[in-house]
Amino acid sequence: DIIIDFNGDFNTIIGRNDVGKSTILEALDVFFDGGTVPLTIDDLRVDAPLADRNIVIGVTFKVEPNKQYDLDAGNLTTLENEYLLDKDGNLQIEKVWDCSSKSITARSLSTFIVANYFSAYAEAPLITQTQPKLKGLCETKGVVLPEGFDGRYSSSYRNALYKHLLDKSTKEVKISIEKEDAKKIYEKLHNEFPIFALFQADRQNKDTDKDIQDP
């Protein structure tokens, strides 16, 4: 794994020719769906074992403490309350492309939120469950809903289930965003991502270019 730290002000990448400076920027372009540099099967490292033919790009974001997000149809909540942050209190997103086929397509991509999450729900994280399933879990586990409980929101049921847990041990869990509420939540978080535009110095940039007109 290669980890690169950026600060919030200004960053410069310095290195000899062909040591991978452009690769870093192109990887960010791929992660942020910039479209300037397409990801191809040839980008997989040549010594990748047959059992692990994946390209993985992860980005970790600092999150404003106690910032509220509309993750649940108008009900504001925090990423802390949803247990979607990593052990350092950051939002960590990991994108994985399956390179076991002859080419990379849209179906090759899987996206995960890497969180410090309750071990008790690691196999089926609560943000991947529908509201009826969450309500059923509350009934099955004998969760006593407090007075004034607002049953309109999935986050209310998740919060009640988390508070009911006796074993609050946690571990790193990769939460897939491919189904149920997780997909909607990720779309809301995606809207908060910074704008990333890659301008290639070795080509002629024009005002009519797509990445200039629509960065």
Predicted regions and their residues:
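P-loop (Walker A) phosphate-binding loop of NTP-binding proteins
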Residues: 16
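Hydrophobic anchor at the beta1->P-loop junction of P-loop NTPases
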Residues: 13
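Conserved lysine of the Walker
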Residues: 21
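Beta-strand elements of well-folded, non-transmembrane domains
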Residues: 8, 61-65, 97-101
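Conserved P-loop NTP-binding catalytic core
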Residues: 25-89
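Core residues of folded domains in eukaryotic genome-function proteins
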Residues: 9, 55-57, 195
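Phosphate-binding P-loop
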Residues: 2-8
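Electropositive, glycine-dotted interaction segments
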Residues: 75-215
